[in-house]
A protein has these predicted regions:
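N-terminal, positively charged nucleic-acid-binding surface of large information/translation enzymes
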Residues: 1-150
Length: 150
């Protein structure tokens, strides 16, 4: 049997920290275990170089998002070496091959009628990077975790 093991793809809005190492080590343990059992394993990790957290961090540092991710992504790769992770591939979402493949997949989804134009309204926390339901919102329409306005 073949196994695909992955970590989250990490935002590169800041340097890597213990949380990044923790989840990567967990995935590495699983990949190593499956390989020891003789299983075919493909283990991937990498960086998500798009999104509001990256834009906000770049603006705060007076740089462009691309400059920020180009500075921080190698730090994530260096972390993998430092903790001796056995990943097979490191993905950067700004890699041209990745961009082309994603565009191809999205085109197929669109061509099959699964993408449509519409509107969505909701309470969004950029630090959580998700929408909050009415039952999750703190007093004053704030994020209960980050205490910022939504």
């Amino acid at each position: 049997m073949s196994y695909y093991v992955t970590t989250p793809i990490y935002y590169v809005n800041a340097e890597p920290h213990l949380g990044h190492a923790y989840s990567t080590i967990g995935a590495d343990i699983l990949a190593r275990h499956m390989r020891q059992r003789g299983e075919d394993v493909f283990f991937v990790t990498g960086t998500d170089e798009h999104g509001e957290p990256v834009v906000i961090a770049a603006e705060a540092q007076g740089t462009t998002p691309q400059e920020l991710v180009d500075r921080n992504a190698p730090r994530f790769e260096a972390l993998l070496e430092r903790i001796d992770v056995t990943n097979d591939f490191f993905i950067r979402t700004t890699n041209p091959a990745h961009v082309a493949e994603v565009q191809k997949v999205w085109q197929q989804i669109y061509d099959n009628g699964y993408v449509y134009k519409g509107q969505y309204e909701g309470w969004y926390c950029p630090k959580c990077a998700d929408f909050k339901g009415e039952h999750e919102i703190a007093e004053g329409n704030t994020c209960p975790i980050h205490k910022i306005p939504l």
